[in-house]
Amino acid sequence: MRELLGKRMIAITGAAAGADGVFLKTCVELRIPAIVILPFPEERFARDFEDAEEWAMTRRLCGVALAKYVAPGCHGAPEAYQVVSRLLLEWADAFLFVWNGRPPEGAGGTGETVDEARDLGIPSRIIDAAGFAASWQTPPEPGRKARHGFPSRAELLDFLDARFPARLDGPIDPAHG
C-alpha cells in the first residue's frame, strides 16, 4: 500500500471487532497516521464487543489516532456499519481487506464493501482470512492519481471536521479502559 499511495499515506478505517482492530494496531506500530470513523458514540459502540479486552485495546488505539469521528445518524446496527462503509468507499484511494471470501452477509459487512469497491474500480488488496494469502481484486492503474488530493493533513482534517457532526479527540479516560 505504501508503494501505491506513497509516504503521505493516511489510513481511514472503522474500528469494528476483529480485523479492523488488527489493522488499526498495525497502523500504530508502523506509524501510519489513522483516522477512525466509529458507527456509534463510544458508549454504544462498546456493546458490540463481546471481549472486554478487545474493546479496551480498541479504545486505546482510537485514542492515538490522528482523528476520531462518529458517523452521522447514529443508526442502529447493522445500518450504522453500512454508513461507515459508505464513508470509507467515498474517501479511500485504495482498500486493504481481510476477508473470508464469503458472499455478503448483511448491510455494512466486509463482503458488501468488497463488492462495492470492485464495482467502483477502487484498487483493493484482499488478504484471505484463513490462509493470509494476499491478492489484488482490483489492481492499481499505473500513474493513478489520488481521488482526494489534500495538500496537507490539516486541510484534510478541516474538511472532515466540517463534514462530521462529532469529532472525538483527547486522551482516553483511564476509568473506561
What are these regions (language model features)?
Residues 1-174:
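Acidic/glycine-enriched connector segments
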